[in-house]
Amino acid sequence: DYDMQDVLDDYLNYCYTDGLIPVSDAWKYMRMQLAGTTFDFNISSSVYYDNAERGFRAHDILGLYKNKSVRAIGKVIARITAVETENGVKYNTEFGELTDERKEVIAKAMDDGDSHGYDLRTIEHRYFFVEKFDETDFKKVTPRAPMGTRIFDLTQILGSNDIPSTDQLAEMLKNETWT
């Protein structure tokens, strides 16, 4: 089941990257990421990072999972890859704007990664910047943590095509659960 989901996610990433799916429906998707160790850094810096080789489905909302629940959500406003080279850090802006402030956050993420044994320096990572993370409690009601990324169609969860602001969405998700 998880292997098939990975194959489907990779295929969707390929389709979006190569323009085979011309209209993005990212507005209705939330990507949930496991963030136990780095959760506090993610919240305080309004960023989440992941290995750049990992594909992903287009999404506007990013959720951070910790302790059996999505604990925070944020609207993605920039997506930037970065890796250290002998000539300094090489950045690639996929979406949004590369600012000096975002470069500083990436440098701090690399330092934070070092403290947890993660190699964010020599392995290219993708940085998802959000406006801010809003606290929520979108509980997983089945045993065991998820095996990795999970995509949620917010229109199905909310029963509406109207996706509210991130702070309102965070409040609404507190009344929902998932398996």
What is each PLM-predicted segment?
Residues 1-136, 143-152, 156-179:
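Charged, terminal alpha-helix-loop-beta segments
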